[in-house]
Amino acid sequence: RVILGDFVTTEDGTGIVHTAPTFGADDYKAAKSAKPEVPPLLVPDKNGNKVPLVDLKGKFIDDIGMISGKYVKNEYYEEDKIPEKSIDVEIAIKLKEKNLAFRVEKYSHSYPHCWRTDKPILYYPMESWFIKVSDLSERMFNLNKEINWKPNSTGEGRFGNWLKSANDWNLSRSRFWGVPLPIWANEDNSEYKIIGSVEELINEINISIKYGNMKSNPFASFEIGNMLDENYDNIDLHKDIVDKIILSTSKGSPMKREKDIIDVWFESGAMPYAQIHYPFENKDLIDKQINFPADFIAEGVDQTRGWFYT
């Protein structure tokens, strides 16, 4: 089947590209907008969840014929286990044998590699947490018209066009260093708790102690409302600490924190509020628009889609 993709040009290549809506963002958008829609290639796992044909280790899943259990890239194998033919060569041969390939040839092209391991990177669909920006894009677009931009073309053009087609914001980042997502879920993801303050977290830990999911409260010595440095020595909200905190559902089942951290741009956007400890202090400065919005901002044009957008 052939579908339209506006990111394909006649300037480079053939003007035709293969599409993998399961693994590529542009491919997914093109497949989603096609009529009828081209669904991503997903199959149910042993728990009934829809998963791609490739697992998180870069191997094809079981029960899909000749490619089952094989790595997508030869570089993923241990040195003494690298097969003579890579999986793409095996597939090409099979397509030729079945007379399903119009043409097969080798060519060199660039491919993203991990800077640490020097191995090929595999794009993979992951579960993430989003801010539903698409519900707010029209309001943001209209509010942007009230800003006195200099030059005006930046506000109406570059930034205005960005807001008009703003996508939902993926907050999740699969890293270690950063602000942990304050979201806890039970094993089957039927119940979530989103923590909005240190006080709320301390209270939830105390509830978990009653259910037997926590033995003690690591932040018991922290005094809510005490802003002295010595008090903040009694609390540590980094990932390696909060990942050990088990909260409890309404029925007492354990809940673990979502493993990801928050996109650093979210922190940047929180600056006007966080710098004055809003909403825990100085509420009038924000609620009565004394400190925010700003009267004047001078910033590089690159930050219109970065910090200023957040």
Each language-model region and where it sits:
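Non-cofactor substrate-recognition interfaces
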Residues: 1-310
